[in-house]
From Swiss-Prot:
This is UPF0335 protein A1C_00850. Pfam families: GapR_DNA-bd. InterPro entries: GapR-like, GapR-like_DNA-bd. One of its GO terms (molecular function) is DNA binding. Coiled coil: none annotated. Belongs to the UPF0335 family.
Length: 78
């Protein structure tokens, strides 16, 4: 592989990574804006983030986590 080809490949990889990093930053800002809008309309952002986290869990894991939380709350009288 010639040095020119290697240089071009490296530049392409770097360019793609830079583009994706910018897209990631843009998406992150969009998510932040959505949370701000939801908050302005009276929604609890902390609760929304908890729901998003729970939605990522497997149904069995979620049921297990709910059962454990209920057990701990009962134990502590909460």
């Amino acid at each position: 592989m010639s040095e020119v080809v290697v240089k071009e490949q490296l530049e392409q990889y770097i360019s793609k990574i830079e583009r994706l990093e910018q897209e990631k930053a843009d998406l992150s800002q969009e998510v932040k804006d959505i949370f701000q809008d939801a908050s302005a309309h009276g929604f609890d952002v902390k609760a929304m983030k908890s729901i998003l986290k729970l939605k990522k869990l497997d149904k069995d894991k979620l049921a297990e986590q709910d059962a454990m939380l209920e057990l701990y709350r009962d134990t502590l009288g909460i």
